[in-house]
Amino acid sequence: MAVKIRLARFGAKKRPFYRIVVADSRAPRDGRFIERIGQYDPMLPKDNKNRVVVKADRLKHWLSVGAQATERVMWFIKKGIVDLETESKKIEKKKVEKVQGQEA
């Protein structure tokens, strides 16, 4: 089963609203999904913090277990809208501090 992280379209006609979901690649675009990990509202202004909302820990989990992100979701990640690197740097920093504390 190939798992994809993709956008599912909701909302009214000419008022799109997207949910960022983890779904089987064979499932319909707006159909059955495994987990909802965020949302994207293109109708909000670009500087609005609620335009793209993602559970970064769940996104990171699904990417680590082999889920493939679609082109648009990867664009969000590369643009820095979804900040995965900051989360991983915080975790690494805590691990380094913990190891140094044990050695001392």
Curated annotation (Swiss-Prot):
SUPFAM superfamilies noted in UniProt: Ribosomal protein S16
GO CC terms, sorted: cytoplasm; small ribosomal subunit
Record flagged with keyword Isomerase: no
GO molecular function, one term: structural constituent of ribosome
Keywords, ordered alphabetically: Ribonucleoprotein, Ribosomal protein
UniProt KW rRNA processing keyword: no
BP GO terms, sorted: translation
Family from the record: Belongs to the bacterial ribosomal protein bS16 family.
NCBIfam families: S16
Protein name: Small ribosomal subunit protein bS16
Record organism: Wolbachia pipientis subsp. Culex pipiens (strain wPip)
